[in-house]
Amino acid sequence: MHCPFCSAVDTKVIDSRLVAEGHQVRRRRECLLCHERFTTFEMAELVMPRVIKSNGSREPFNEEKLRGGILRALEKRPVSMEAIEKGVNHIKSCLRATGEREVASQLVGNLVMDELKSLDKVAYIRFASVYRSFEDIREFGEEIAKLEK
């Protein structure tokens, strides 16, 4: 890695440690020419599958869209941002674990519902009512009854 201070080509790693629950490596480096020290962070670049929408169109996976939908469902609910980020990362891991280049939007929606069910039941019902297009109060009641079992 080039030195950010003098642009020298040679640097050496002084210290390496795992951070971000083991998903990132923090490296402390020293330039062999100017002896300045600096920190770098390294993480795997993982490709997310494309999403096949219900109308048949395809689009790249959009993490912000995923996070936005979850945040909307959890609005004014007592769930920490840390728990939300863990949920987003869990959904992304599940999608990558399929090993597929493309996944149906229904799979993404079902993963979101599963995650919301474990985070907050009210948010789950909010999301389910939109995702499953509830038509009347009876459908809300049926979904709530399933949760109470």
Swiss-Prot record:
Note the PROSITE patterns from the entry.
Answer: ATP_CONE (PS51161)
Can you name one GO molecular function term for this protein? zinc ion binding
Cofactor(s) required, per the database record: Zn(2+)
**Which GO biological process categories is it annotated with?**
negative regulation of DNA-templated transcription
Could you tell me the keywords of this UniProt record?
ATP-binding, DNA-binding, Metal-binding, Nucleotide-binding, Repressor, Transcription, Transcription regulation, Zinc, Zinc-finger
By its UniProt entry, which InterPro entries does this protein fall under? ATP-cone_dom, NrdR-like_N, RNR_NrdR-like
Domain ATP-cone as annotated: residue spans = 49-139
Q: Name one Pfam family in it.
A: Zn_ribbon_NrdR
Q: How is the cofactor bound?
A: Binds 1 zinc ion.
The unnamed zinc-finger regions cover: 3-34
Give the record's family classification. Answer: Belongs to the NrdR family.
What function does the entry list?
A: Negatively regulates transcription of bacterial ribonucleotide reductase nrd genes and operons by binding to NrdR-boxes.
The UniProt entry, under PANTHER family, shows:
TRANSCRIPTIONAL REPRESSOR NRDR
Name of this protein: Transcriptional repressor NrdR
